[in-house]
Swiss-Prot record:
Organism per entry: Cyriopagopus hainanus (Chinese bird spider)
Function: Neurotoxin. Selectively blocks neuronal tetrodotoxin-sensitive voltage-gated sodium channels (Nav) with an IC(50) of 44.6 nM. Does not affect tetrodotoxin-resistant voltage-gated sodium channels or calcium channels.
Entry remark concerning the domains of this protein: The presence of a 'disulfide through disulfide knot' structurally defines this protein as a knottin.
Matches recorded under InterPro entries: Huwentoxin-1, Huwentoxin_CS1
Residue spans crossing the bilayer: none
Prosegment location in residue numbers: 22-49
Record's protein name: Mu-theraphotoxin-Hhn1b 2
């Protein structure tokens, strides 16, 4: 009885660890994919703007995102995104 309870708990612990690792990898993959899709190509700058538009790469310490469009530089992803709730 004790052995079967121990095996059941060990199995549940193992299932939790596997699910957590899978979810963590999935989040990292989606963040990398989003960052690569929205990455700024330095070779094709085109016209210089006073501020950066949505999805443009930015530096959080020097936020150059367009304030008139309610954009802020995301510290986590390092691209301009809409500021929600302001």
């Amino acid at each position: 009885m004790k052995a079967s309870m121990f095996l059941a708990l060990a199995g549940l612990d193992l299932l939790f660890v596997v699910c957590y690792a899978s979810e963590s990898e999935e989040k990292e993959f989606s963040n990398e994919l989003l960052s690569s899709v929205l990455a700024v190509d330095d070779n094709s700058k085109g016209e210089e703007r006073e501020c950066l538009g949505f999805g443009k790469g930015c530096n959080p310490s020097n936020d150059q995102c367009c304030k008139s469009s309610n954009l802020v530089c995301s510290r986590k992803h390092r691209w301009c995104k809409y500021e929600i709730g302001k």
